[in-house]
From Swiss-Prot:
It comes from Influenza A virus (strain A/Duck/England/1/1956 H11N6). One of its GO terms (cellular component) is virion component. Influenza RNA polymerase is composed of three subunits: PB1, PB2 and PA. Interacts (via N-terminus) with PB1 (via C-terminus). Interacts with nucleoprotein NP (via N-terminus). Belongs to the influenza viruses PB2 family. This is Polymerase basic protein 2. It is found in: Virion; Host nucleus. One of its GO terms (biological process) is viral RNA genome replication.
């Protein structure tokens, strides 16, 4: 204050003002400060001062040929005097205006391609709708969000290689483009940017925006996908929010969303199979999302969600070190604990074995709709500060924290028996048993917890057992806060291990994730998810199982038919026929299977009864363990569309319809593919007689040497294989029979098999 008063007094004297405005600045320190180094010390001032001059710009001498000395208004555009210290010309700002209006034009075709992300953003904003502004307290929590809509998911290194290859193809330096996405993008961009005149550095910068995910740790209340984040400054302030619907979606958000849907479906399906881990890996490797292999997306995409992280762990990728319980992400912020098994009694006198965490610990809990800070000691909740969007969300967080605290009053609040099971009908572990129990009904838990009077603390209020707010009393240790708790900001990833039952543990053996933590929410994916694994056929119901099973047989008919004739047992045990069994009425499975297998054996034995369409139609029924009975069927029942529908053993039906003219198969009216061969068997050729005593195995196999003529076959030993040239120059693989007794049927089946092998 003293200094300011002193300055005011000085300024009131006219002499002071004169000194400050009129005298030259010749103090060495000041001159040094403003002239040393290349860095401009006061850019704004410099700009104003420069632009006040007549010719603030310097340009190359060639400009004198390209721009007139005066414009239409007669104003001078450049000065004949050289710029001091260089051979450049001094130019007026008016010259820029002249150039922009009358200068040479260039092709603009590359601009939308290079500045694609900007053009797309403008489109999204143009078509977006802004709703009303609401004034209310904003509970924002910092989350790691994607700030760059419309990007691919390349790593920085991968993107760098692509950019170098596209923008500076002749530069030296090893560039390895390995991933499919790298190659596709490089090819596409090279074509798009042919003869592009935009500065290479600018192109490189813009390409980086398109290829790499950029994330920031920002305070958000509401949507976290990148199309919302790009308008964050327009949609939420400290005390207001504006409703907004984006005017378009971007692929990266769709990939994130679809990845979560696919991962959840896969984890749920794997849980119920005999070997969950093997099944999960098989499904991840055979699934595509929007035409890209799921495993490639998992390697590149940083989305953190329980199911996604389980898939990543299975692939041996690192994941975040936080753990999940009750749908909340827990991160320990201080303290430590040791684990010890302890037996406890529920209110129903059921014994539970729980792993007790002994020691003082603090955690942040972050969920989709609520966040909290939890301080706990051994089997005791010390303090829980919750914030959430609504009463329901806050209650969810409180239940999870109370169960996690392992307090005795929580365990004693259990009424009835705990016998929750997972999808595979296995009992859940005790902690999840308790969680499920109270998620169904927490009344007793809240009533038994106890309440306490509270102090008036800014921004905090109490919450009563019926979940209503109060300023006087609150559940013991629990407070509701206006402020959210930030998500864990670190992006560090740790090495984890996963067991057969998909439980993910860190190096110290703490369970971070398990299938119980995977949300049951059924979302609809934005991008097409193609599950090639037969394990996922049932995801869209019985009809899809039926169609997929027949499509699979037709797609693999080449190998299927050879197995059908040589090794039917291997064929019947294929996992692709498993989902189909759930469609066949339980009581009939064994009888149908026995019937079909007998029928197939007759086809193998008797001339002219081989019928491709019939084999395809009945094959899935033969996969069940057969019952030996003399039962004959004219139709087989499958349960689809809520009732039993019939497949006719001979002839077409609405379920299975083969059109001879088009050679296409429709299953329940859906196209299931085309048969590439002619199912009508013709007359036996001469080869069948000659090939007596040989078994036709299928197409030519180069490992067995060059093709022999039919006459040379007599030299083969029993069980020996060879390629043979038959008929119209076709080559098939045969094996000399080990037993003579079966020679009779050879000539009958040979024709059919030759036909099959050639086709």
């Amino acid at each position: 204050m003293e200094r300011i008063k002193e300055l005011r007094d000085l300024m009131s004297q006219s002499r002071t003002r004169e000194i400050l405005t009129k005298t030259t600045v010749d103090h060495m320190a000041i001159i040094k400060k403003y002239t040393s180094g290349r860095q401009e010390k006061n850019p704004a001032l410099r700009m104003k001062w420069m632009m006040a001059m007549k010719y603030p710009i310097t340009a190359d001498k060639r400009i004198m040929e390209m721009i007139p000395e005066r414009n239409e208004q007669g104003q001078t555009l450049w000065s004949k005097t050289n710029d001091a210290g260089s051979d450049r010309v001094m130019v007026s700002p008016l010259a820029v205006t002249w150039w922009n209006r009358n200068g040479p034009t260039t092709s603009t075709v590359h601009y939308p391609k290079v500045y694609k992300t900007y053009f797309e953003k403008v489109e999204r904003l143009k078509h977006g709708t802004f709703g009303p502004v609401h004034f209310r307290n904003q509970v924002k929590i910092r989350r790691r969000v994607d700030i760059n809509p419309g990007h691919a998911d390349l790593s920085a290194k991968e993107a760098q290689d692509v950019i170098m290859e596209v923008v500076f193809p002749n530069e030296v330096g090893a560039r390895i483009l390995t991933s499919e996405s790298q190659l596709t993008i490089t090819k596409e961009k090279k074509e798009e940017l042919q003869d592009c005149k935009i500065a290479p550095l600018m192109v490189a910068y813009m390409l980086e925006r398109e290829l790499v995910r950029k994330t920031r740790f920002l305070p958000v209340a509401g949507g976290t996908s990148s199309v919302y984040i790009e308008v964050l400054h327009l949609t939420q302030g400290t005390c207001w929010e504006q409703m907004y619907t984006p005017g378009g979606e971007v692929r990266n958000d769709d990939v994130d969303q679809s990845l979560i849907v696919a991962a959840r479906n896969i984890v749920r399906r794997a849980t119920v199979s005999a070997d969950p881990l093997a099944s999960l890996l098989e499904m991840c490797h055979s699934t595509q999302i929007g035409g890209v292999r799921m495993v490639d997306i998992l390697r590149q995409n940083p989305t953190e969600e329980q199911a996604v992280d389980i898939c990543k762990a299975a692939m041996g990728l690192r994941i975040s070190s936080s753990f999940s319980f009750g749908g909340f992400t827990f991160k320990r912020t201080s303290g430590s604990s040791v684990k010890r098994e302890e037996e406890v009694l529920t209110g129903n006198l059921q014994t539970l074995k729980i792993r007790v965490h002994e020691g003082y610990e603090e955690f942040t809990m972050v969920g989709r709709r609520a966040t909290a800070i939890l301080r706990k000691a051994t089997r005791r909740l010390i303090q829980l500060i919750v914030s959430g969007r609504d009463e329901q969300s806050i209650a969810e967080a409180i239940i999870v924290a109370m169960v996690f605290s392992q307090e005795d009053c929580m365990i004693k609040a259990v009424r009835g028996d705990l016998n929750f099971v997972n999808r595979a009908n296995q009992r859940l572990n005790p902690m999840h048993q308790l969680l499920r129990h109270f998620q169904k009904d927490a009344k007793v838990l809240f009533q038994n917890w106890g309440i306490e009077p509270i102090d008036n603390v800014m921004g905090m209020i109490g919450i009563l057992p019926d979940m209503t707010p109060s300023t006087e009393m609150s559940l013991r240790g629990v407070r509701v806060s206006k402020m959210g708790v930030d998500e864990y900001s670190s992006t560090e990833r740790v090495v984890v291990s996963i067991d057969r039952f998909l439980r993910v543990r860190d190096q110290r053996g703490n369970v971070l994730l398990s299938p119980e933590e995977v949300s049951e929410t059924q979302g609809t994916e934005k991008l097409t998810i193609t599950y090639s694994s037969s394990m996922m056929w049932e995801i869209n119901g019985p009809e899809s199982v039926l169609v997929n099973t027949y499509q699979w047989i037709i797609r693999n008919w080449e190998t299927v038919k050879i197995q059908w004739s040589q090794d039917p047992t291997v064929l019947y045990n294929k996992m692709e026929f498993e989902p189909f069994q759930s469609l066949v009425p339980k009581a009939a499975r064994g009888q149908y299977s026995g019937f079909v297998r007998t029928l197939f054996q007759q086809m193998r034995d008797v001339l002219g009864t081989f019928d491709t369409v019939q084999i395809i139609k009945l094959l899935p029924f033969a996969a069940a363990p057969p019952e030996q009975s003399r039962m004959q069927f004219s139709s087989l029942t499958v349960n689809v569309r809520g009732s039993g529908m019939r497949i006719l053993v001979r002839g077409n039906s609405p379920v299975f319809n083969y059109n001879k003219a088009t050679k296409r198969l429709t299953v329940l009216g859906k196209d299931a593919g085309a048969l590439t061969e002619d199912p009508d068997e013709g007359t036996a050729g001469v080869e069948s007689a000659v090939l007596r005593g040989f078994l036709i195995l299928g197409k030519e196999d180069k490992r067995y040497g060059p093709a022999l003529s039919i006459n040379e076959l007599s030299n083969l030993a029993k069980g020996e294989k060879a390629n043979v040239l038959i008929g119209q120059g076709d080559v098939v693989l045969v094996m000399k029979r080990k037993r003579d007794s079966s020679i009779l049927t050879d000539s009958q089946t040979a024709t059919k098999r030759i036909r099959m092998a050639i086709n």
